[in-house]
A protein has these predicted regions:
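Active-site neighborhood of HAD-like aspartate-dependent phosphohydrolases
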Residues: 1-36
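Conserved SAM-binding loop
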Residues: 5, 76, 94-97, 131, ...
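Substrate-recognition/cap helix-loop segment adjacent to the acidic, metal-dependent catalytic center
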Residues: 25, 47-50, 81, 85-95, ...
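Short acidic capping loops at alpha-helix termini that bridge into adjacent secondary structure
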Residues: 31-35, 116-122, 150-154
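Metal-dependent phosphoesterase signature
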Residues: 46-85, 90
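Structural recognition of alpha->loop->beta junctions
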Residues: 112-125, 186-206
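Conserved Lys-Pro-Asp/Glu-containing loop-to-beta segment of HAD-superfamily phosphomonoesterases
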Residues: 133-164
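Acidic, Mg2+-coordinating phosphoryl-transfer loop and its flanking beta/alpha structural elements
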Residues: 155-194
Length: 212
């Protein structure tokens, strides 16, 4: 979600990166922002367990608190709702997924009114499926919920290489978008089916590929 359909940049820094950095630093663990950026798209608890050592439980509690304190400041990526409406008009089922904790993911979706306004059909996260990307577990869970059997009918859109790998592992079509913090060259190395500037270009790509 963050970087693909959710704009989590607050005061020039993505909320997830700032929350990572500050929660680690509070416990005397210095992690370069560049290292944290490489972890985008991964399950947040797993990242903190990997980098935080014995301090990980306390760091994770602070991390979640920082996210929750700032959730009302996040907004959707420009044009996301319009794209969702276009997809709905063309009978496309929509699921969003995240590496955020379940309660945080739920609260972001609620804050943006996506479910209540009928803009998406389903949400899930790595904590719910108990597997992190690049496992295709979140995609497969969404497919089951939305009664989709053929993964070739799924288009996975993501702003991270690990998200694109997740799409490959599910045998779905994959689209990288440049609205996150990972560079085009890095995303292209993951071999997505297309690289778009943002989700706003998705309808045009689907029409060009005769998929809508």
């Amino acid at each position: 979600m963050a970087g693909t359909t959710v704009d989590d940049v607050i005061d020039g820094v993505p909320l997830v990166l700032r929350s990572y950095y500050d929660s680690f630093k509070r416990h005397g663990v210095e992690i370069p922002m560049s290292t944290l950026n490489e972890m985008r798209g991964r399950d947040k608890r797993e990242v903190i367990n990997m980098l935080g050592g014995e301090k990980a439980p306390a760091i994770y509690r602070d991390f979640v608190s920082m996210l929750e304190e700032n959730l009302t400041k996040v907004k959707e990526i420009s044009g996301a709702s319009e794209v969702f409406r276009w997809l709905k008009k063309h009978d496309v089922r929509i699921a969003v997924e995240s590496g955020f904790p379940a309660l945080v993911t739920r609260d972001i979706v609620k804050h943006l009114h996506w479910l209540e306004n009928g803009l998406i059909d389903y949400w899930t996260c790595s904590e719910i499926v108990e597997e992190e990307r690049p496992s295709p577990a979140m995609i497969r869970r969404a497919m089951r919920h939305l009664h989709i059997r053929d993964p070739s009918e799924v288009v996975k859109v993501d702003d991270t290489t690990i998200g694109i790998e997740e799409g490959h592992n599910s045998k779905s079509l994959t689209i990288a978008v440049l609205t996150g913090t990972q560079r085009r060259e890095k995303l292209e190395a993951a071999k997505p089916d297309a690289v778009l500037n943002s989700i706003r270009e998705l309808p045009g790509w689907l029409e060009e590929m005769h998929l809508a």
